[in-house]
Each structure stands twice: as C-alpha cells, then as structure tokens.
Amino acid sequence: MILYPAIDLVGGKAVRLYKGDYAQMTVYSDDPVSVAKEFQKAGAKRMHLVDLEAAKSGIPANADTIRAIAENTDLFLEVGGGIRNMEILETYLSLGVDRAILGTAAVTDPQFLKEAVEKHGDKVAVGVDLKDGFVAIKGWTETSNLTAEAFFEKMQALGVKTVICTDISRDGAMKGTNRELYKALSEKFSIDLIASGGVSSIDDIAALKEMGLHGAIIGKAYYTGAIDLKEALEVAR
C-alpha cells in the first residue's frame, strides 16, 4: 500500500484544518518545502498536496510553493484544490505535478472530468469528500444528494483510475478511519482507492493495507507525532 504524507497549503504555509473548518486552522510549518524534504528523508516516495485557498476560491494561490516542492524533491506529487477547468488543471501539471485531483468539479461538471480523463489519463484523479455516506462539495460546505456508491459507479464508467476518498466526519479529528466504508467500496469497484481522513494510528494503516487498499493519506497524525512516518512506511510496505 502506498502512503501519501500530506501538506495542506494556506498562504505558502503547511496547515491543518479541524473537520474541514477554515476557522479552526493550525499552522505546522512556514516552510512546506522542508516538510516535503523530511517526507522524502523518511522514505516516502509520494505526497499529497492541497491548496486550501484554491479549494474555496478556484484560484491557485500556492503555485510558487508547489513548484518549489516539485523542483526540490524527487517525490511523486498529487495536488488538489479548486481544479475546475482545463486551464487550472494544466497549470498544475506545468508546475511539475504528477497527478491533479478534481474534487467539486467531478460532481458538478462531469463533461470537464470526461475531457480531462480523455486528455490526461491517469494524471487525473478524483477526490471525493463523503459526509454520512453522501458526497460533499465546495470545500466541504455543501452536501449533495449523491451516494458514495452511485458516485463510484459514475467514476468507473468515465475511466477514472484513482479516487481519493475522505470521510469528513473524521478528517483531522484523529478518530480513526471509516474502515467499513473503504472496505465496501474497494471490494465493489476496480478503482485504485486512496483512503484519507482520520488515519490516526499505525493500526489504521495495517488495517487498510489488509483490505488491499491502494493507498492512504497521512495528515494530522504525522504532525502531532501520533504516527512515525518511517514506521508507517514499513507497515504499509
């Protein structure tokens, strides 16, 4: 199983939100490039980046930081946040990003998603935020009437290869992952499923690996010291 340590970006800084609430933000580092280098030093091969400002506004606000991480590490970078048209998607790819994650747009603009997958293939992934089994959109502020299962069916039909699945009732709350949900989705669909949100212990990582999940994202648990990245990478391997 592949581990993706994560950096959420606001104003060029590495931050974390509590349960997706922009008012409850903790700044962990003023230098995200050095954080990314620490990931690499610990043995990580990939990382997950989210431009939280772009997730809200649709305008890439941390492009310089993302480019600097791409230029100063050998990590495979996946980036999400506000990718709502081809121009923004291709801007991210031009910064040296290996995979761009479509979130809100995958729900609200299926035509764009279809074109993006046709043009860029597996350089395009989809990030879905789930709240109580339904898809949430617009930086977690709205819930749609689309169930997780119906959403995955659509993605599979469109040829999406990778879906990052976040249970936002658990994200950043250190409550442990929603194992039942991930297990059901990974058994039913042939999509590479990356679990995100609430991965708070080595036990979580071991359990997700046992389910045969493609990957898992580690956020807050790394920054608080609840998970040692080196150990986590060993367990996932």
Please give the residue ranges for each predicted region.
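Conserved, mostly hydrophobic/aromatic
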Residues: D8, F39, M47, Y92, ...
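Conserved anion-binding
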Residues: K19-A23, D98-D171
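Glycine-rich, proline-tolerant flexible connector loops at the mouths of alpha/beta enzymes
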Residues: R46-N62, T104, C165-K175
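Conserved beta-strand positions in the central sheet of alpha/beta enzyme cores
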Residues: H48-D51, E78, I101-L102, A125, ...
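Glycine/small-residue-rich loop that forms an oxyanion/phosphate-binding "nest" at active or ligand-binding sites
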Residues: E53, A61-V117
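Charged helix-capping and loop-helix junction motifs
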Residues: P60-R67, T141-A150, K175-K183
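Catalytic cores of alpha/beta
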Residues: T73, L77-G96, E180-G215
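Glycine-rich phosphate-binding active-site loops on the catalytic face of alpha/beta enzymes
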Residues: S94-F112, G198-S201, M211-L229
